[in-house]
Amino acid sequence: LKRINKLIKNILRTPFEGIGKPEYLKADLSGYWSRRINDEHRLIYGITKTDLVIISCRYHYAK
């Protein structure tokens, strides 16, 4: 949980760069970004003009 909170704080400051190796996603998740929580789990998120939208905090993309 600490790692996720740290990632969220970093995303709010710099949405497309920083810790967790930000990666722009393609195909079904086009328009979203991912960051590594650890080797197994990814934080998948999107950014609007006013909000951070988190769509997943578990597994690598979808399981």
List each model region and its residues.
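Enriched for short, Lys/Arg-rich terminal
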Residues: 1, 6, 16-19, 25-26, ...
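Acidic-basic catalytic patches of nuclease active cores, encompassing PD-(D/E)XK
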Residues: 12
